[in-house]
């Protein structure tokens, strides 16, 4: 009986810790990726292909992405609009 109560308490405590502190605090070896590469960035605003992703024209998507990714970025089509997408470096 006591053993069942102890196991129940340990499981309950683990669930509470997961909810309160989140997974990144429970498993600190799993880091949060702060890289802008391989991601879309709608915050950059409207992306015009051939203009905003052109390195020679100093396009805003290209400028945003080249700061954190060595291969820059391009305007990627999502549904009916283009969004700035930074290329995957490597």
Swiss-Prot record:
Paired cysteines (S-S): 37-88, 47-75, 61-84, 65-86
Principal cellular location given in the protein's record: secreted
Entry's Gene Ontology BP terms: defense response to fungus; killing of cells of another organism
Signal sequence extent: 1-22
GO CC annotation, single: extracellular region
Keyword annotations from UniProtKB, A to Z: Antimicrobial, Disulfide bond, Fungicide, Plant defense, Secreted, Signal
Subcellular location: Secreted
Keyword Secreted attached: yes
One Pfam family linked to the record: Defensin_like
InterPro entries: Defensin-like_20-28
PANTHER family noted in UniProt: DEFENSIN-LIKE (DEFL) FAMILY PROTEIN-RELATED (PTHR34453:SF3)
Recorded family membership: Belongs to the DEFL family.
Protein name, per record: Putative defensin-like protein 20
Organism for this UniProt entry: Arabidopsis thaliana (Mouse-ear cress)
Organism ancestry: Eukaryota, Viridiplantae, Streptophyta, Embryophyta, Tracheophyta
């Amino acid at each position: 009986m006591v053993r069942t109560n102890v196991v129940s308490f340990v499981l309950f405590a683990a669930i509470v810790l997961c909810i309160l502190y989140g997974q990144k605090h429970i498993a600190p070896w799993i880091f949060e990726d702060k890289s802008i590469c391989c991601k879309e960035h709608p915050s950059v605003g409207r992306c015009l292909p051939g203009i905003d992703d052109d390195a020679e024209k100093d396009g805003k998507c290209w400028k945003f992405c080249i700061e954190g990714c060595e291969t820059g970025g391009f305007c990627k089509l999502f549904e009916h609009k283009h969004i700035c997408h930074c290329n995957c470096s490597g």
